[in-house]
Amino acid sequence: MMDNSGPKMGAADGAAGIPYYEKQRQHLKELLNKKKLLEKRLLAQEESIYQKETEYLENTPAGNIITGFDNYTKGTANVAAQRRKTGLTDANRVFSRSSISYNPAAQQDSQTPASSAPASHAPTPVSTSFNNKDGASSAPTPTSATAGKANSKKKKAATSGGAGVEDSETDSRETKKARTNFGAVRK
């Protein structure tokens, strides 16, 4: 039977492997330093893109290439005030969101203290609907909620017609809009 242990190395072969190991280790350190440098440059570039994008979106409240020029053509003056109230949405950040590696939330997390527990270790929330294990839940299911609404409209129409109370829902359905004649007569 064949021996799978591989070639036997003597003391001389082991001594020759140490310089090769040290050379590879030094090469690995250089590559890791190069990777860190590239990551820093990439982060700086992505931050620059984010800042320029923010500046562009804030300086063009009436209309821009991303949100469209509807407000620009309408000439509305309330757009800037509305933008300040709502803020810039991430959906408009086309360029900074296109990067796979850019994550502004990771930068905010790195600034928070490390004593906080990560989200994956948070306790599982307990729903109150599971507390009643003996009987049925009082929470409506999607089918029971929609089925009840369909029947309730018929009930409302019947009760409002019988009681004489005018309801705005049934009132608008019962009255028909009169046809306006502008002089043209159909024959």
Swiss-Prot record:
One cellular component GO annotation, for this chain's record? Answer: nucleus
Q: Which GO terms describe its biological process?
A: chromatin organization; DNA repair
Annotated stretches, region: Disordered = 99-187
**Keyword terms, alphabetized:** Chromatin regulator, Coiled coil, DNA damage, DNA repair, Nucleus, Transcription, Transcription regulation
Keyword Nucleus in the entry? The reply is: yes
UniProt lists compositionally biased (Low complexity) regions at 104-129, 136-150
Protein location? Nucleus
Signal peptide bounds = none
Q: What is its main location?
A: nucleus
**Coiled coil where?**
20-49
This protein's assembly is summarised as: Component of the NuA4 histone acetyltransferase complex.
Function field: Component of the NuA4 histone acetyltransferase complex which is involved in transcriptional activation of selected genes principally by acetylation of nucleosomal histone H4 and H2A. The NuA4 complex is also involved in DNA repair.
**What does the sequence similarity comment in the record state about its family?**
Belongs to the EAF6 family.
Please identify the protein, giving its name as recorded.
Chromatin modification-related protein eaf6
Its lineage opens with: Eukaryota, Fungi, Dikarya, Ascomycota, Pezizomycotina
